[in-house]
Amino acid sequence: MHRLITIGSWALIILLFLQPGIAHKGSVEGIRIFTTALLPYLLPYLVITQLFIRSQNSFLNTTSKFKLYFNIYLLSAIGGFPSGAAVITSLKDLGTLNKSNASWLLAICHAPSPMFVIGFVGIEIFHTQIAGIKLLLIIHAVNLIFLLVFILSSPPIHEKTHIQKLSDSPFQESIKETYQILLLIGTTVIFFTTVSFIVFESVKEIFPNIPSMLLVFVASLFEMTGGISLAGEMLSGSMFLPFIVAVIIAFSGISIHMQIIVLAQKANVPIRKYILFRFLHILIIPILFFLL
């Protein structure tokens, strides 16, 4: 693994020197995506959820595993990824979740923002809001089945003997935690957008007659939104467009995965289950969306 990372790093360094203009263009695009598409939505949501989970209320302070885990899923579903991962890792740091439960929930509570699926994917790509709603319902139906199995098989939650001290300044702590999360997300988005631009342009130069499907694969490998946009352009009118878009969303892109993995490692949450469930998503969700 270390040798592979070393080879990949040297390859990217060489490509950066050979294509500085494209690297700059990719960085600018990454900054644009973060500041215009992610930051305005993520910042208020993260501040509110961080403030919310730091308050002692019955929504999360409960010994009912059904209520606790479903409410965590609800918070994750509203925000979409990587907001859900931020909520789960914060709850792990606060002691609401242990390492095992946080690992399971990180794997299960993985879904794109409803506004993204219904608005961008449904209206802009499929040109019908119903298709976006159907895809979103399939994603959450699959996740909720996994969640129910986890809840039924998980041990009961015991009453805490140690009462966590209330924060003297929950708003200030929420701002501080949000800043750290956004810094991780922003850096990851900009980096992988730059990498995707470099790899995408290099592939087009080396293989000028590359099939459209492979170009879509290259674009979506690193960054989900760019891959979906390209699929909508190159595969417009194709009967396979819904299946391809569902595959891209189920895979989510390396950029999203790295954002979540960085958050998980920061909170010392294992990621093996998360990786396993991403493969299950890729196998299940596109087939259901294509057939239903």
Where are these regions (language model features)?
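Juxtamembrane/transmembrane-helix boundary motifs in multi-pass membrane proteins
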Residues: 1, 24-33, 68, 100, ...
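Selected transmembrane alpha-helices and immediately adjacent juxtamembrane segments
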Residues: 5-47, 135-210, 283, 287, ...
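Hydrophobic faces of alpha-helical transmembrane segments in multi-pass integral membrane proteins
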Residues: 9, 40, 44, 48, ...
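Hydrophobic alpha-helical transmembrane segments of multi-pass small-molecule transporters/permeases
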Residues: 10-13, 30, 34, 47, ...
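Transmembrane helix-loop junctions in multi-pass membrane proteins
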Residues: 17-28, 51-60, 119-121, 126-129, ...
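Short, non-transmembrane cytosolic segments of multipass membrane proteins
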Residues: 63-68, 148, 152
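Alpha-helical membrane segments and immediately flanking helix-loop junctions
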Residues: 64-126, 217-265
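Membrane-core helix-loop-helix motifs of multi-pass transport proteins
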Residues: 97-150, 259, 263-287
